[in-house]
Regions:
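Core catalytic lobe of class I
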Residues: 2-114
């Protein structure tokens, strides 16, 4: 199993886990095609949080272009019968879903009500 993380506080959790920290696009580009069974991801929301990691795009279009780069890699590395779960802020979720539907067969939208 490979787990890509941005949080440096997460540590190696066992002998079957390859924990990698870094830019997820660079790490995914190095992964073989059709090699992943499940992708569960919580990308930045786009200007919801006050932190720099969530405010690195000037426009929604720039954020969505970056998000589409992620989706391109997910499509490449995910096995044909693999699953993808991604979180999105409600304010931009509709646009994110349009991008996802261009590349994947969306079976269900799950709403997490906190």
């Amino acid at each position: 199993m490979i787990l890509l993380v941005a949080d440096s506080s997460i540590r190696h959790m066992g002998p079957t886990l390859d924990l990698q920290q870094g830019d997820c696009l660079e790490l995914m580009r190095a992964m073989p095609a059709n090699s992943v069974d499940l992708i569960a991801t919580d990308p930045p929301y786009y200007k919801v949080k006050g932190d720099a990691w969530d405010r690195q795009w000037d426009t929604p279009a720039a954020f969505l272009a970056w998000f589409d780069l992620l989706a391109e890699q997910w499509q490449r590395i995910l096995r044909p019968n693999g699953s993808l779960y991604t979180f999105a802020w409600p304010g931009i979720a509709a646009e994110v879903e349009v991008l996802i539907k261009r590349r994947f067969n969306v079976l269900q939208r799950i709403t997490w009500a906190k």
